[in-house]
Design a protein with these regions (language model features):
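A compositional/biophysical signature of low hydrophobicity enriched in polar/charged and small residues
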Residues: 1-97
């Protein structure tokens, strides 16, 4: 499984319906699980992003599909980054010639 960091902002619609956010989070977890992944962490944040989630998924295509499906609801905008573990980082650096 690959790890992904998902940076999330509410849209105007998302802020207007913020009380429904916990239900949307539960739905997002189910959508990720249906794609073969798992949300491992979720944070409400202060600053540039409203929320941050950490998820594991089998591949980039699965995550792209999930993020597009969740974005279709209109309540959030996301920026997703593929993350590498420290061990993966060490392997990548070791391959530099």
């Amino acid at each position: 499984m690959s790890t992904y960091i998902i940076l999330i902002n509410w849209t105007d619609q998302g802020v207007r319906t913020v009380k429904e956010s916990p239900q949307r989070l539960a739905t997002a977890k189910k959508v990720i699980e249906a794609a073969g992944g798992k949300m491992t962490s979720f944070y409400l944040t202060m600053g540039r992003y409203d929320m941050v989630a950490i998820a594991e998924a089998p591949n980039d295509e699965s995550v792209a599909t999930v993020m597009l499906n969740l974005g279709r609801g209109g309540g959030i905008r996301t920026e997703t980054m593929r993350a590498f573990t420290e061990d993966q980082y060490q392997d990548i650096i070791a391959k530099i010639q």
